[in-house]
């Protein structure tokens, strides 16, 4: 019995020993083959992988003027595996001028996978970005006391000008979504957020380099691993040359002070955008440094939406500028001829429907209808097109033919400009009206679209592109703001001609109408210019005051610039649109404004539209008025007080003064 018990114990003890050895073998296998934590730990003690950031590409205007460049900056990086429990937190915070609460929160955020998806305790993580030179100097002197913390040299953007914020855009620290979308980025990297900085991010950013450095047992750098055999040099980003003319852009922004709206100028011969103004705007120089987030938050909360690029994101009724597209459609489709005349008795009257018009001679033909901007002419044209049964089976077919013309002119779809956020506008089709009117509609139902009202909306860019298309007599290039990318050919999408459905003859008559408008019609303010300008006004109806719109180009027979101006609540097209458009033409073609032009520009710059007391410019005006009123009140009160004081009375002769 005792022998059996002894044998039993021996097996039990042996089994336990085998189990223990098996566990150790499995654990060893897991550590060595299944997990690389120990390898990473060993490597992190022996090597330091240092990322070298490339210089981001510079940005120039079309004349070679520097717009955006780089400036040295310093970031504090931390390797958590080295820093844990090895620094004096108070001394560290004092060296950087931060609070202990900030230090604790920042360290927690770094280790939070939700906020920092690429976190690893063995690699460098961003602790603090964009130190000033003074902060860097103070920290560098004491850095040896803070193991695990390193200084990373990089560059940040600087903007040479206060103009062109919506074109240039800005850069900011990557978000978790950016990191997830592109594994090139790591926490703390920078990425283009708006404008060309975003659209051309891959061209501008370059390629990161890397240095592998050797460290001793105390973590001190001993030099490059294998003399840099495994290092990779950073590749600088490519420079961009914009199509923007800085002087023209600056003039446009000056003219739009105190107004909401947009100016877009295009070179019809290339599709290059010469100027793109969106008002109100902001100074791009406030979107750099550690205050960027705060300033961006303030701008995004601003009721007047200064971050919105109205040139490509604003969808507006084009008003009477749209009549040019209708003339092209009616003529090409044979609905009208140059001699076709329609009645206008202060408007369009048909079967109880009335669309108003201003007073002018009637009946009126095509060229004069464009020159005087007759509403009735274009309403009659659409009415007869929708009702023409010799050409179209029904209004449904006629409507879709009409829409095909509009789409061929670049309406209803994104033009494809090289900026993020472009909107497509709205061009209705027959299906749209069938849905909304349950199949019960005709030419009278939709007649307002013929004069750029109703459901039709365009962006200012699309209106300017219409001007460029007319200037070219029937084709356009995709508008673009980048003229050249360093060492790269221009994208073929920007060199391809897009032809419209309208014929050349119809364009010649529309040009004649726009030239007549500039000489004696609604755009006659352009007649002062020393070159042949062509234009078309628009007064787009609105719930409040009408919008002031202009579209034109110059010179007539060798077009160099096409312009669209849109001023919200500006009233008649001739009030704001025409003078601003004329000044933009004059500046670009002549290189400067004449004395008369300068006087007009000065007057236009200081004209304000009453959007409300909180609109930029209105605040200063209201504050000045309030200050003047207070001063006047104080002066009146002082005078009243003086009047109430007893006046001295001279003693009469013989009386003794008391």
Descriptions of predicted regions:
Residues 1-293, 315, 398-408, 450, ...:
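Periplasmic/cell-envelope proteins involved in peptidoglycan metabolism and beta-lactam response
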Residues 208, 540-543, 607-610:
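Short acidic/His-enriched helical or mixed secondary-structure segments at domain edges of catalytic enzymes
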Residues 489-493, 600-609:
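Intrinsically disordered, low-complexity charged/polar segments
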Residues 216-221, 225-231, 269-321, 325-573, ...:
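Beta-lactam-recognizing serine transpeptidase/beta-lactamase-like catalytic domain environment
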């Amino acid at each position: 019995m005792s022998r059996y018990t002894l044998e039993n114990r021996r097996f039990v003890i042996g089994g336990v020993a085998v189990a223990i050895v098996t566990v150790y073998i499995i654990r060893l296998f897991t550590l060595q083959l299944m997990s690389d934590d120990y390898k990473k730990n060993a490597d992190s003690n022996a090597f330091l992988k240092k990322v070298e950031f490339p210089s981001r590409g510079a940005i120039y205007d079309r004349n070679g003027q520097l717009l955006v460049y780089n400036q040295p900056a310093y970031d504090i990086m931390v390797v958590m595996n080295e820093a844990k429990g090895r620094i004096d937190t108070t001394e560290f915070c004092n060296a950087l001028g931060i609070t202990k609460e900030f230090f604790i929160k920042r360290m927690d955020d770094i280790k939070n996978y939700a906020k920092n998806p690429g976190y690893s305790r063995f690699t460098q993580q961003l602790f603090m970005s964009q130190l000033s030179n003074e902060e860097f100097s103070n920290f560098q002197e004491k850095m040896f006391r803070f193991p695990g913390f390193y200084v990373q040299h990089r560059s940040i953007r600087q903007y040479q000008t206060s103009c062109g914020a919506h074109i240039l855009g800005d850069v900011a620290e990557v978000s978790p979504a950016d990191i997830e979308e592109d594994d090139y980025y790591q926490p703390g990297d920078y990425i283009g957020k708006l404008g060309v900085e975003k659209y051309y991010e891959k061209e501008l950013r370059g390629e990161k380099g890397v240095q592998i450095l050797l460290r001793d047992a105390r973590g001190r750098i001993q030099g490059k691993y294998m003399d840099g055999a495994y290092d990779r040099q950073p590749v600088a980003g490519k420079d961009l040359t914009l199509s923007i003319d800085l002087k023209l852009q600056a003039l446009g922004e000056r003219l739009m002070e105190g107004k909401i709206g947009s100016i877009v100028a295009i070179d019809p011969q290339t599709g290059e955008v010469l100027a793109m103004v969106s008002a109100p705007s902001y100074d791009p120089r406030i979107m750099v440094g550690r205050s960027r987030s705060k300033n961006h938050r303030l701008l995004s909360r601003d009721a007047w939406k200064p971050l919105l690029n109205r040139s490509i994101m604003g969808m507006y009724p084009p008003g009477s500028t749209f009549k040019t597209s209708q003339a092209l459609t009616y003529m090409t489709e044979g609905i009208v001829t140059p001699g076709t005349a329609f009645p206008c008795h202060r408007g369009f009257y048909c079967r109880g429907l009335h669309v108003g018009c201003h007073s002018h001679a009637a009946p009126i033909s095509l060229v004069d209808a464009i020159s005087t901007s007759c509403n009735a002419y274009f309403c009659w044209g659409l009415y007869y097109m929708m009702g023409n049964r010799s050409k179209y089976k029904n209004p449904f077919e006629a409507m879709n033919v009409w829409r095909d013309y509009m789409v061929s002119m670049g309406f209803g779809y994104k033009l494809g400009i090289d900026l993020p956020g472009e909107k497509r506008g709205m061009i209705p089709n027959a299906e749209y009206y069938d849905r909304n009117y349950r199949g019960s509609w005709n030419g009278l139902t939709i007649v307002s679209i013929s004069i750029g009202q109703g459901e039709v909306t365009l962006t200012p860019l699309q209106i300017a592109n219409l001007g460029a298309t007319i200037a070219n007599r029937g084709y356009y290039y995709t508008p673009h703001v980048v003229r050249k990318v360093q060492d790269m050919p221009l994208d073929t999408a920007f060199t391809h001609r897009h032809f419209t459905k309208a014929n050349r003859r119809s364009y010649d008559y529309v040009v004649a109408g726009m030239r007549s408008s500039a000489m004696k019609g609604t755009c006659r303010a352009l007649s002062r210019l020393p070159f042949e300008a062509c234009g078309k006004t628009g007064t787009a109806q609105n719930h409040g005051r009408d919008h002031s719109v202009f579209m034109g180009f110059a010179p007539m027979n060798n077009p160099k610039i096409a312009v669209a101006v849109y001023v919200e609540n500006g009233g008649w097209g001739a009030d704001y649109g025409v003078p601003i458009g004329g000044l933009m033409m004059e500046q670009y073609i002549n290189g400067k404004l004449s004395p008369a032009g300068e006087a007009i520009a000065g007057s236009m710059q200081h004209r304000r539209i009453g959007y409300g007391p909180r609109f930029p410019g209105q605040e200063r005006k209201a504050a000045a008025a309030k200050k003047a009123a207070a001063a006047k009140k104080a002066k009146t009160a002082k005078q009243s007080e003086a009047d109430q004081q007893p006046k001295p009375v001279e003693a009469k002769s013989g009386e003794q003064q008391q």
